[in-house]
Swiss-Prot record:
The lineage of its organism: Bacteria, Pseudomonadati, Pseudomonadota, Alphaproteobacteria, Rickettsiales. Pfam families: SecG (PF03840). The chain crosses the membrane at residues 1-21, 54-74. It is found in: Cell membrane. It comes from Rickettsia bellii (strain RML369-C). This is Protein-export membrane protein SecG. It comes from the Bacteria. It is a multi-pass membrane protein. Coiled coil: none annotated.
Length: 100
């Protein structure tokens, strides 16, 4: 479960970076690479509105997923040292003679 959420978290982060870089800025951002500089006013507003909504949705999903990952990873799990100590306590001392 934790691995799946971690994969989803990384995927959301990559998508969020791409969407943020595609948004228009003073120099048109990366969207000008695909010929976005010649768009009409209506299509430019539509694309900008879509990218803004996508950014908000992806950022919200990123935040929610980060909180879930933090909660899952903070749950108490027995660590390796306690498992080793438990095994050592349960072992029989082999140096003692055994009566037959």
């Amino acid at each position: 479960m934790l691995d799946i959420l971690l994969f989803v978290h990384i995927t959301i982060a990559i998508l969020l970076i791409i969407v943020i870089l595609m948004q228009r800025s003073g120099s048109d951002g990366i969207s000008s690479i695909s010929g976005g500089g010649n768009m009409g006013v209506i299509s430019a507003k539509t694309a900008n509105n879509f990218l803004t909504k996508s950014t908000v949705i992806l950022a919200s999903l990123f935040l929610i997923n980060a909180i879930i990952l933090a909660n899952l990873s903070s749950q108490k799990k027995p660590d390796l040292v306690s498992k080793i100590n438990e095994i050592e306590e349960n072992q029989v001392d082999n140096s003692l003679p055994i009566a037959k």
